């Protein structure tokens, strides 16, 4: 009887109807926030996704979707892109979302997880840290197209 009941539950779960879940969040914890260079928008992470909204409040627009975990949004100096940490490639990398063409680009493409991204003042490079046992607290510099990386000596 126990096996039969378990089989019924598995069958119900397998062929059950999918339901769309939605929620309204009015507060959160451990949220990373960045203000756009023009001071009109904010970007923030909540429950593993990146959102933007007016600095005056209102409805947030999701930049990321799906099952990946996304965090630490940072506007580019010109405000046309947002960099963030995401595991969408299987490991934490720095990704950039371009508002103009709505495309995502993996900037780091490393075997090591990369975190704590920040932009160069001209927006042509991003910097991030990675846990590399060969180098103490390495800071990596990446150009925006991911074809060059170098370790920046720290302290």
Outline where the language-model segments fall:
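Beta-strand-rich domains and repeat architectures in extracellular enzymes and scaffolds
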Residues: 22-53
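A flexible loop/linker signature enriched in serine peptidases of the S9 family
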Residues: 27, 45-51, 59, 65-71, ...
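Short coil/turn segments that connect the beta-strands within blades of beta-propeller domains
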Residues: 38-40, 78-80, 122-124
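Sec-dependent signal peptide recognition
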Residues: 2-8
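Hydrophobic h-region of N-terminal signal peptides that target proteins for export
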Residues: 9-17
């Amino acid at each position: 009887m126990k096996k039969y009941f378990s089989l019924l539950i598995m069958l119900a779960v397998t062929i059950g109807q999918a339901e769309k879940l939605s929620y309204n969040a009015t507060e959160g914890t451990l949220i990373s926030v960045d203000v756009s260079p023009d001071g009109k928008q904010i970007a923030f992470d909540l429950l593993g996704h990146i959102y933007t909204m007016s600095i005056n409040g209102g409805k947030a627009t999701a930049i990321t979707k799906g099952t990946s975990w996304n965090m630490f949004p940072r506007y580019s100096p010109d405000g046309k892109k947002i960099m963030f940490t995401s595991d969408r490639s299987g490991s934490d990398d720095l990704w950039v979302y371009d508002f103009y063409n709505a495309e995502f680009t993996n900037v780091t493409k490393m075997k090591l997880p990369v975190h704590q991204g920040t932009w160069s003042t001209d927006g042509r490079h991003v910097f991030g840290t990675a846990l590399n046992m060969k180098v103490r607290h390495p800071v990596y510099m990446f150009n925006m197209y991911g074809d060059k990386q170098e370790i920046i000596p720290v302290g």
